[in-house]
Amino acid sequence: MWWPYLVLALLSGLEASGFPRSPLRLLGKRSLPEGVVDGVEVYSTKISCKVTSRFAHNVVTTRAVNRADQAKEVSFDVELPKTAFITNFTLTIDGVTYPGNIKEKEVAQKQYDKAVSQGKTAGLVKASGRKLEKFTVSVNVAAGSKVTFELTYEELLKRHKGKYEMYLKVQPKQLVRHFEIDAHIFEPQGISMLDAEASFITNDLLGSALTKSFSGKKGHVSFKPSLDQQRSCPTCTDSLLNGDFTIVYDVNRESPGNVQVVNGYFVHFFAPQGLPVVPKNIVFVIDISGSMAGRKIQQTRVALLKILDDMKQDDYLNFILFSTGVTTWKDSLVQATPANLEEARTFVRSISDQGMTNINDGLLRGIRMLTDAREQHTVPERSTSIIIMLTDGDANTGESRPEKIQENVRKAIEGRFPLYNLGFGNNLNYNFLETMALENHGVARRIYEDSDANLQLQGFYEEVANPLLTNVEVEYPENAILDLTKNSYPHFYDGSETAVAGRLADSDMNNFKADVKGHGALNDLTFTEEVDMKEMDAALKEQGYIFGNYIERLWAYLTIEQLLEKRKNAHGEEKENLTAQALELSLKYHFVTPLTPMVVTKPEDNEDQTSIADKPGEDAPYAATSTAYLTSHQSPPTPYYYVDGDPHFIIQVPGKNDTICFNIDEKPGTVLRLIQDPVTGITVTGQIIGDKGSSPYSRTGKTYFGKLGITHAWMDFRIEVTTEKIILGTEDELSTFSWLDTVTITQTGLFVAINRKKNMVVSFGDGVNFVIVLHQVWKKHPLHQDFLGFYVVDSHRMSARTHGLLGQFFRPFDFEVSDVRPGSDPAKPDATMVVKNHQLTVTRGSQRDYRKDASVGTKVTCWFVHNNGEGLIDGVHTDYIVPSLF
């Protein structure tokens, strides 16, 4: 049972190509703010956790600034639970956002292969220890520039030993001016307890930095240490924030079950309390081959002795040891009486290593022993059987073919009881152990070779030590529920919880009934939950302040998780179908899974660098870095096209290392078609505004774009951007945001990020990326008013049929400039340009690129084409006038 676990670290280093600065140059330098390490200041780190009904939505945001006088590489590291799905990542440099795009693995694989062939690979996500996988991305940041990293991931919190636990392992590695962990919890059942603690700080110091509270359905935890509280000593400049921050809570349970319904999706939680424990019949099948010698066998003995101390007198048990052959403690199961337990301890203390690894015969002997006990009625009728195997290697004697061992075990068990496989260390075929466990209603777990391996073994036993119900079935009215997640379980263990989710066939349903049936220690039990939809709506109204579609996403999370699990031991057409279902949902709900990596494009030295974040499997050794398809490669420079200012159209021509620009002089209110692609269905239009008080009939004076329209015909999606607000969605369902918002919106094939008062990014999958810049002027300015700039950052997925004032230039074209001569302005020479079979007189000038700085911009020199771009654009500029934005 994995718990939410997150490690945060931010590192900085010298640019690879830079030389160490002379110490003499540092003398007399101005002092840098505290928290600056190697020229980079991490001035803000916030971990925002929003939990609604066990479903956690976590956002990790780190902001840094390069205070050095040269470029620096800044890295962002987050360790997150292996069971979590990354849902979003954005990298923002000087106000320009670069989003991550989630895509099918086959597409990303091509980029991986290309990078490998070029010798350029670097992992974004890789396995990292027992419960974690590490997300890492780095970027070169120019002197004086700021960078923001934001990672979002989601996970269903599992109940373990009677509580939900969220671990945040914090490692900023330097003092951070604004460091905060902020967790909001909403539980419709009501919160019964909430606590938080940190392993890296004393309770006295923690108390002043930590606030925690809960009342009714809401809980809140905030940890905001000051700079002084972060210091490892009163005069130190290094941070003591290095350890676990733990949030623990549980909920009220007036009844064993709880059903919640939102927007046609439901989740059904089930966790009965106070039931007597079902006696268990347990066989431990232990590998004692030569590879278990030393600490492994010693730790195994310690763990088994502790397990014997926890056995209940109603339980039955036996030990089977396998090496080259098979040895049993007793010929059959025996009751856990005090005398038998003492004899068992003597046997365990005598266990020693020898021989090879005969997994097949060891397992079959244990299965036969449990089967015989049930058939011969030597164990209680109302009891449950469990087999636990521990091995540290692969079968190498007897039957050693993994597929044949799986077949033998499957036929022997016949679904009667679960098999739990524990893999000790890394030198084994974990996929084999996991597949065999899953197809026999169990799970596999890796036991890590460490000083606490015995505690890991004990911990697993404690999870299965107290079954309260067996053969659990969750039932709903026939034809009322669609797309149901797993609803049958061989056992329900004390302190845990089952979660079943699905979709209502009729969203107008007034009520429905949910039954949970299972075999208890004394009798068969049925737990019924009556769901009244009106009462449900009233009870859940408060949850809107967290996030409203949480049950639908929870359902998607569970469904994908279970499809991927089934896929592990499926074959042929069944595996193809499971893969297709999981892939479709992963793309729809924007989850990074083993089928859907995330591609992150970031700027590196005027080139785009593409990195791929894949999700590694448990079979990957956690120290390895080459087990996942995680790549980084350099792609050719991307040409840019934009319109900003008066309005100035700027076209950077690939292969020419030069830029062309032109103006369109039209009266305010005119709408121009900027881009139209009939293949992708993407259209962009812009409406012209003038200075304050300008006449709608006048073409004189400065004009700008005050409104932009973006549509995607095939997605039935549109965006209207003004200097005041952003309206987006389908024609029937529109959402409105202001430029005061900071918002990220994702759905399949779409990413939108609004950066407060700066810009917004619009991406249609990988290969179509626009940036809209907001220019704000003094509100009381007598002449000028706010306006917009439109930038095409990436267009390589647009088709060859794309047209429009900007779109026509996405296709390759050439031009030649000659006869450079003095112009009417000595600072702006004239020249002759030959382009598209036209000979034009052009003037050298400069415009501004405002993507990184909307107030000052970056100077761009260009050849200016006069007369509304005549001779450069296809046709005349009036051909591009359209009646409206949409």
UniProtKB/Swiss-Prot annotation:
Instruction: Report the principal subcellular site.
Output: secreted
Q: Which residues carry this modification: Aspartate 1-(chondroitin 4-sulfate)-ester?
A: 646
In this chain the VIT domain maps to 26-155
**VWFA domain location:** 279-439
Task: Give the record's glycosylation annotations as residue positions.
Answer: 88, 577
Q: Where is the signal peptide?
A: 1-18
Q: Which InterPro entries match?
A: ITI_HC_C (IPR010600), ITIH (IPR050934), VIT (IPR013694), VWF_A (IPR002035), vWFA_dom_sf (IPR036465)
Give the matching SUPFAM superfamilies.
vWA-like (SSF53300)
> Annotated Gene Ontology MF terms?
serine-type endopeptidase inhibitor activity
| Keyword Secreted on entry | yes
Q: What does this protein do?
A: May act as a carrier of hyaluronan in serum or as a binding protein between hyaluronan and other matrix protein, including those on cell surfaces in tissues to regulate the localization, synthesis and degradation of hyaluronan which are essential to cells undergoing biological processes.
Q: What is this protein called?
A: Inter-alpha-trypsin inhibitor heavy chain H3
Gene (UniProt): ITIH3
